[in-house]
UniProtKB/Swiss-Prot annotation:
Belongs to the Ap4A hydrolase family. This is Bis(5'-nucleosyl)-tetraphosphatase, symmetrical. The gene is apaH. Hydrolyzes diadenosine 5',5'''-P1,P4-tetraphosphate to yield ADP. Keywords: Hydrolase. The lineage of its organism: Bacteria, Pseudomonadati, Pseudomonadota, Gammaproteobacteria, Enterobacterales. SUPFAM superfamilies: Metallo-dependent phosphatases (SSF56300). One of its GO terms (molecular function) is bis(5'-nucleosyl)-tetraphosphatase (symmetrical) activity. It comes from Buchnera aphidicola subsp. Baizongia pistaciae (strain Bp). Its EC number is 3.6.1.41. CDD domains: MPP_ApaH.
Length: 278
């Protein structure tokens, strides 16, 4: 049995299949960890969703921002981002099942035995693992609830909240505000300001010497020293810019880059060139 990690697929189904063929992936024994953003941008989002959902317990994925946005579109939430690709996906005959399956997926995964952490955008540097797990479980519970559309409506249509996670406590009166900020951490985070706020606009690589902004993985978090953190979301990151235990998996396949896969047991990388022209 082997354990594989793959970054943002974004509808690049052919590349995913070629990559799995390279390692003779066995869906009955191997385990596939995915950083989310299965859909949008690439041409075959529906095929990706159907394949990944068919893997059962042999896939361990987390939700990305595009996955959450698809759920919001399905629920007809105002201000969720529309595209022709997403609209076509919503017309598929099995969309009800696929959305139900997506709603059951987590935002944050931890394997304490293997010392693995995974979320789509990374780990907020001012949290410990227990705090991150607590926020994730609260949001996951909301998405699994039959009133999930009410929660998403709040997230998408009440945007006047600053991104200071350390000022929020999930068990106090501002619970929904805190959960909105936490969802941004799990699915959209890249940079933090010196005061701990998230910067939600800059997508450039840290090598561009952006003043006053720090990528989340450059802020020391002692609770992560014994863990390996896998994340996606940031296709513009340059190779080897993260600390050794922080592994970036989004290598821009949907932008004409490559789809990357990491095998845990021997720390070996595999790549597949994108079929999309730059």
């Amino acid at each position: 049995m082997s354990t594989y990690f793959i970054g943002d697929i974004h509808g690049c189904f052919n590349e995913l299949m070629h990559l799995l063929e390279k390692v003779s992936f066995d869906a009955n024994s191997d385990v596939l960890w995915l950083t989310g953003d299965l859909i949008n941008r690439g041409p075959k989002s529906l095929e990706v969703l159907r394949f990944v959902s068919s893997l059962g317990d042999n896939v361990k994925m987390v939700l990305g921002n595009h996955d959450v946005n698809l759920i919001a579109l399905y629920a007809s939430i105002k201000n969720s981002k529309k595209s022709s690709l997403m609209n076509n996906l919503l017309k598929s005959h099995d969309i009800d099942y696929l959305i139900y399956w997506l709603r059951k997926q987590p935002l944050f995964r931890v394997d304490h035995k293997k010392k693995i952490i995974m979320s789509h955008a990374g780990m907020y540097p001012y949290w410990d693992i227990q705090t991150a797990s607590c926020y994730a479980k609260k949001i996951e519970s909301m998405l699994c609830n039959h009133n999930y559309d009410t929660f998403l409506d709040f997230l998408y249509n009440n945007s006047d909240i600053k991104s200071k996670l350390y000022e929020c406590t999930v068990f106090k009166n501002r619970e929904l505000e805190c959960l909105k900020l936490a969802l941004n951490v799990f699915t959209r985070m890249r940079y933090c300001l010196p005061n701990g706020e998230l910067d939600m606009t800059c997508k450039q690589s840290p090598s561009k010497n952006i003043s006053s902004l720090l990528p989340w993985f450059f802020i020391k978090n002692s609770c992560l020293e014994d863990y390996c953190v896998f994340f996606g979301h940031w296709a513009s990151l340059e190779k080897n810019i993260t600390p050794k235990n922080i592994i970036s998996l989004d290598t821009g396949c949907c932008w004409g880059g490559i789809l990357s896969m990491f095998r845990l047991e021997d720390k070996k990388w595999f790549v597949q060139e994108s079929e999309i022209k730059k």
